[in-house]
């Protein structure tokens, strides 16, 4: 009798398991999913996370440069993943809770809205000191946990880059830096100006981003703006959205009252904001005009002509040469760098401020410059 009872129990267990299997089959079928597609998504998510673990290669060398793709958005070789390169300055972050919070907002928004194809990789470059690099390695896996795309992380030593950069930009520092001298430590703020000379030639294009951003759109769409560059353009950059350069060019404007220098859009030349930049490094390398403008004599001539004295580094340089050579720049729409700072509205330019600050169209990236709070989605 005991044997018969145990046998009946065994049969009941088998029948119950079979019933569960049938229910599960129809449940997943109703969701239009199957074992293969579900497994595929899991694997893709695991790959995107694993590429940033401690065992990943985080050397300062760029391991994945690719020749230019046909579409102009990523860099690829046949049979290899297409790579999209983005760079951020990540220095002294370990000593600033404010910078850490800004970084969290930026990277979480990239992960939230980022969408790439299966064979594409977002390569995240960080120019960093040792302490910030250590912190970044701890923060990034958590911040990118929700990313559905593959990514790689590359840290560049700020000291090594500065050593290469300083001889190239030393002469321009007195025109575009705070203070009256040249400061070795400040050279890194001109990285975008001469990145084409110190990065490997395999790196064709890169997007440089400030730390105080919040994406509301897919970062991949930003790379598509490279496709819209006119023939002579080497840099994509949005206009400055405050009357900063109306103020900076005051003397030139006084001497040239019919000039549009410093005037608001659409007809004026308001200058540029470097919070979001598309750098076509290949085009920068091959542009005779752009490289001539890096020569100390040409720089000094333009600075004298426009009575220019700035303190915003690369942004000032691009603004000044843009007054003379607009063809070198592709103006990004204000939605790709929706600056939020309103400092100049309260400091003498309230009557014209809105002419600069207005931004029609969708906002893809908020830029919380001058510590301005960024709206919640």
Positions of PLM-derived features:
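Glycosyltransferase catalytic domains, chiefly GT-A lineage
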Residues: 2-377
């Amino acid at each position: 009798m005991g044997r018969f009872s145990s046998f009946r129990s065994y049969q009941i267990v088998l029948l119950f398991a079979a019933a569960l299997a049938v229910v599960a089959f129809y449940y997943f079928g109703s969701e239009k999913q199957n074992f293969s597609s579900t497994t595929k998504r899991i694997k893709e998510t695991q790959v995107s996370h694993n590429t940033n673990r401690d065992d990943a290669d985080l050397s300062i060398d760029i391991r994945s440069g690719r020749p230019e793709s046909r579409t102009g958005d990523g860099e690829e070789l046949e049979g290899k993943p297409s790579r999209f390169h983005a760079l951020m300055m990540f220095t002294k972050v370990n000593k600033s809770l404010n910078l850490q919070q800004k970084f969290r907002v930026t990277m979480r928004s990239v992960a939230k809205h980022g969408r790439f194809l299966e064979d594409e990789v977002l390569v995240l470059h960080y120019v960093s000191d040792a302490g910030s690099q250590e912190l970044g390695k701890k923060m990034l896996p958590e911040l990118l946990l929700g990313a559905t795309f593959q990514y790689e992380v590359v840290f560049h030593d700020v000291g090594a880059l500065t050593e290469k950069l300083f001889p190239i930009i030393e002469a321009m520092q007195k025109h575009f830096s705070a203070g009256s001298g040249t400061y070795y430590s400040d050279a890194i703020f001109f990285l975008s100006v001469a990145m084409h000379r110190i990065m490997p030639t395999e790196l064709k294009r890169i997007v440089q981003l400030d730390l105080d951003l919040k994406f509301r759109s897919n970062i991949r769409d930003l790379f598509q703006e490279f496709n819209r560059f006119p023939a002579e353009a080497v840099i994509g950059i949005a206009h400055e959205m405050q009357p900063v350069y109306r103020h900076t060019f005051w003397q030139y404007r006084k001497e040239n009252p019919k000039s549009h220098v410093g005037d608001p859009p659409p007809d004026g030349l308001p200058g540029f904001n470097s919070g979001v930049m598309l750098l076509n490094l290949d085009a920068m390398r091959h542009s005779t005009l752009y490289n001539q403008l890096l020569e100390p004599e040409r720089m000094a001539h333009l600075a004298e002509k426009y009575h220019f004295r700035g303190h915003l580094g690369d942004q000032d340089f691009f603004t000044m040469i843009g007054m003379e050579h607009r063809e070198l720049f592709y103006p990004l729409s204000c939605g790709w760098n929706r600056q939020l700072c309103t400092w100049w509205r309260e400091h003498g330019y309230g009557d014209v401020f809105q002419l600069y600050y207005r931004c029609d169209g969708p906002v893809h990236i908020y830029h919380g410059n001058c510590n301005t709070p960024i709206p919640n989605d």
